[in-house]
Structure formats: C-alpha cells, structure tokens
Design a protein with these regions (language model features):
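Intrinsically disordered, metal-sensing/regulatory segments
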Residues: 1-269
Length: 269
C-alpha cells in the first residue's frame, strides 16, 4: 500500500479504473459459458449496481463536497448543489446528442442524434455513457487526496474504486449478453462488452488532472460526478432493472448494493 501511496494521483486513478475496467471485462466473460442470463437475475444485478452508485454518490462524493465547502465564503450547500445540477445537465446533454440504445429496446427507440449505426454499437454506447461519470468520480476522488484535504483519504478513494468495480460486473454482463443473444460470436460479444469500460480510465485522468490544476473546483467536481452518476441511475439503471415486471428484485438488489458500498466507504474511508 505504501508504494501505491507514493504514486501520482493520475497514476493512482489509472490503476483504480484499470481495476474497474477489469471488472467490466469479468462481467462480460459469462458469454463464453452461456448464451443468456435470466431477466430476473439481470434485474437484481442492475438493481445492485444502482444501489452502489447511489451510495457512492453520497458517501464518497457529496458528503466530502459539503464538508469541503464549510467555512468558505459561500454557503456550504451552494457549491455541492451547483456541481450536482451541472453534472446532471451535462449527462442529459450527452444523452440527447450521443446515439445510443437502452437494453431491451427496439432499434426504433434509439435516443440521441439519428444514425444508421448498428444496434450493437448503440447498446455499447449506452453503457459507455454509464461509465463516464464513474471513471470521473474515481479520478476526482484520487485528485482530492492529493489536495491534502482532511475529508479526502486514499482509503476512501480506493473504496470508491472497489465499489464501482463491483457494480461494473453486471454492466459488463448487460452489454455482452444481448450481443451474444443476437448472434454475435462469443469472442466479439466479450470484446465489445469489455470495451464499454474503456472510457473509465480516460475519464479518471480528466477528473484527477482537473482537480490538481484547480483545487478550488474540488467541491464542484465531486458533486458534478455525483450528479452525473445519479442521472445515470434514474434515467437508465432503475428502468432497466425492472424489465421482468417484479420490482422487488430490483429494489432488494438496490438495498443490498447501497449497504455494500456504505460499508466499504465507512470501513475503509
């Protein structure tokens, strides 16, 4: 751990999101064994992912942002509120522009700018859209540690990366399985499934670098990442987690995911 502590925050963020990317790849790997996962299982897994993201948004991002804002010239609630709204608006803008397709939807229901891209490409872009704020959150968390603020700890940043990695497993499955079900080869389904997570290391570097270059934006950056993550949860994960019609599965999964992430953050952070 001491060797990891001595690395630059950008390298730490890269390693942290390298783990989360690896978990996306691991989640894509079941296509080598089965062609389909029961919808009920997917609903529970996606609910779990939603719970992890909600907990991470508060415990790892919003709470530190509020604490950092206390004692400043502005009201303590203002920087986190502004950053949170901007994060949601940013993701909403990308959602309107980037062509993508939600899981289980027909090609006619594709969102964003009109395109002739194949269904599989649109599915991959949808999950890639999920992963950007997750990578950004990890990068900002490691950047905050380098800023030497008491509310930001290396263990907390590691806990966030661990939680994001855990919830990336079902997201990898959610990309790879539909591709396999539509007739794509096992190898291609796996390849595109893991590829959806490649945006996380890129976003992490952006987040860590932004915080290092401008420390005063840290409360805004943390809450920005939280707003973007909550947008993804409400816009995509929760609806996708209820496709079987049994809302209890998604709800129980979300409760479990929230609890796991809360334990990780409190125990390690």
């Amino acid at each position: 751990m001491s060797a990891f502590e001595n690395l630059s925050p950008i390298i730490q963020a890269l390693l942290g999101t390298g783990f989360t990317w690896g978990m996306t790849a691991l989640g894509s790997a079941p296509v080598f064994m089965v062609k389909e996962v029961k919808q009920e299982i997917m609903d529970g897994m996606l609910g779990f992912a939603a719970g992890v993201m909600i907990a991470a948004s508060y415990w790892s991002l919003l709470a530190p942002a509020i604490e950092m804002s206390e004692g400043g010239t502005l009201p303590a609630w203002l920087p986190p509120a502004v950053g949170f709204i901007l994060g949601g608006v940013f993701l909403a803008g990308i959602d309107k522009v980037l062509p993508h397709l939600h899981l289980g939807m027909p090609i006619e229901a594709a969102e964003g700018l009109k395109t002739t891209w194949h269904r599989s490409v649109l599915l991959i872009l949808a999950i890639t859209l999920h992963n950007f704020p997750e990578g950004l959150a990890v990068g900002v968390a490691f950047g905050a540690v380098a800023a030497d603020l008491p509310s930001a700890t290396l263990a907390g940043a590691v806990a966030l990366a661990l939680g994001i990695g855990i919830q990336n497993f079902p997201e990898g499955t959610a990309v790879a399985m539909p591709l396999r079900r539509e007739g794509m080869s096992r190898l291609k389904s796996f390849w595109y499934g893991q590829l959806s997570g490649i945006v996380e290391p890129i976003a992490a570097v952006i987040g860590a670098a932004a915080v290092l270059l401008a420390r005063p934006i840290l409360p805004y950056a943390l809450s920005f990442a939280a707003g973007a993550m909550i947008f993804v949860v409400v816009e995509e994960l929760i609806p996708e987690a209820q496709r079987s019609g049994d809302t209890n599965l998604a709800t129980n999964g979300a409760m479990l995911g929230f609890t796991v992430m809360m334990i990780l953050d409190v125990a390690l952070g």
